[in-house]
Regions:
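Conserved small/polar residues in nucleotide/adenosyl-binding loops
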Residues: 131-133
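Contiguous, glycine/small-aliphatic-enriched amphipathic segments in soluble metabolic enzymes
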Residues: 24-129
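Short, Lys/Arg-enriched N-terminal segments with co-localized hydrophobic residues
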Residues: 4-23
């Protein structure tokens, strides 16, 4: 069992003998992971990581937040605040890279306004000085 007061995972590695070989049950999560999806290629990479490396071995429980620029625009950036509050609640999160808009991105994405950096917003809410991605 892994327990760092924030993430609690109970590993059930019960090996069962089947007719065709051995199988292991998945690691069970007791605390959900706050999943902050990002923009562009990071969406694809995160999905590959989940599908290939995590889901086959872990009964992955997540609370999903789409921090892609289009969705932040649709929600007036409320999704960024909600994801940070969920991180405070559960104590563990994965955040993918996001776009901080500039003038060119404002036109490209037809943004309502030039939204602040999600990293800066999340750092302020969580009282952090640095986010490692």
């Amino acid at each position: 069992m892994i327990n760092n007061n924030k993430l609690k995972i109970t590993a059930r590695q019960q090996i069962k003998r089947n007719a065709g070989g051995m199988t292991m049950s998945k690691i069970q999560m007791t605390t959900p992971l706050v999943e902050m999806d990002g923009d562009e290629m990071t969406r694809i990479l995160w999905k590959m990581i989940k599908d290939e490396l995590l889901l086959p071995f872990i009964d992955l429980k997540t609370e999903y937040y789409d921090l892609g620029l289009e969705h932040r625009n649709e929600t007036n950036d409320q999704v960024t605040f909600d994801s940070a509050e969920a991180t405070k609640k559960y104590g563990v999160a994965v955040k993918c890279a996001t776009i901080t808009p500039n003038a060119a991105r404002m036109d490209e994405y037809d943004l309502k306004e030039m939204w602040k950096s999600p990293n800066g917003t999340i750092r302020a809410i969580l009282d952090l000085s640095l986010i490692h991605i």
